[in-house]
């Protein structure tokens, strides 16, 4: 048993070291070196306004269309609600997007307003009407008739499962799958266009590869259920895949305004919050060590482990910390301390009844577990409700951010309280230190608490 506990301890130590290597680097050139992200209220960011082209939208449908635009943009840049991006309507035809951080790339900006609707075209015959023209010729939409209705082949008939892959030669592939209507259209069109080119367009432009040449593959066989698009760079294919899966914009967007936003709280607040947090943690550790002796010291070590793991997760997800997110982290830290106090109170009771340390540790954790589980499951349910509510309101990003940070923190706190602290205590079972009651409680046997 002691050998097993020793191996578990080494695994915990290795996890601690790994978490430190993730948390500590802030140099962007280092592995995982990007610092923890801060929200618009703490670090500033970018304020952008987009104008929607509603010229082809019936007036009675404007609200539904604009709500759809907000949803698609939110899914593109804020799928988990942890980047704290704000997407809101302004008037009838404008969308305001606020992105935290001052290092937003042009690619990230382009991701927001991109329509993400691919249209497939066939070469137009001389004298025929055409929609696109490029170096390969003039193109008209590729269409087919199903049950008397004419359809145009577009990515609107893709299933939401496109992904990026590589072929055996390492070439980038954007893999897609047709839905039922798309499969019928693709079968009819590719049967008709065997040994001819099929153009791919986005908006008014042809989809082009790294070399700038329009992508227009020759149809070598009938394509029915799925297909691939070759010639894109990895970044372009990945961005397009994400946007296709998130959904296409129902109307075109035009950027009309962009401004850098200063933080509302700023670095001074961050510095004060860090100092206050460190003072609070030190005071909690002093209390636990004074009241629970050795278990309190071990819990303090587990609390440090908890903090490092949570911060590592914040970087890996990544979570953008705002005032709301910091609040979720603090609440989860309090719950981590609360779990340890419940365990140690039970442990002390068991020791005072005359049990050995090993028996007291197992009994203490067993008796405290139901209370810890109930309180944490209740918190998880509350997080789920908050996450859902945050997704139904325009300014819900902070609510979703609070829910996610609280969920991550509480999940890690359960792990550290039940697994890490327990393993550290088990290391003392059967040792001389483990037989010294004074190291585990300020009371003596025979006295009631």
UniProtKB/Swiss-Prot annotation:
The chain crosses the membrane at residues 6-26, 272-292, 294-314, 317-337, 379-399, 401-421. It comes from the Bacteria. The keyword Protein transport applies. It is a multi-pass membrane protein. GO terms for cellular component: plasma membrane. It is found in: Cell membrane. GO terms for biological process: intracellular protein transmembrane transport; protein targeting; protein transport by the Sec complex. Keywords: Cell membrane, Membrane, Protein transport, Translocation, Transmembrane, Transmembrane helix, Transport. SUPFAM superfamilies: Multidrug efflux transporter AcrB transmembrane domain. One of its GO terms (molecular function) is protein-transporting ATPase activity. Belongs to the SecD/SecF family. SecD subfamily. Part of the Sec protein translocase complex. Interacts with the SecYEG preprotein conducting channel. SecDF uses the proton motive force (PMF) to complete protein translocation after the ATP-dependent function of SecA. HAMAP family: SecD_B. This is Protein translocase subunit SecD.
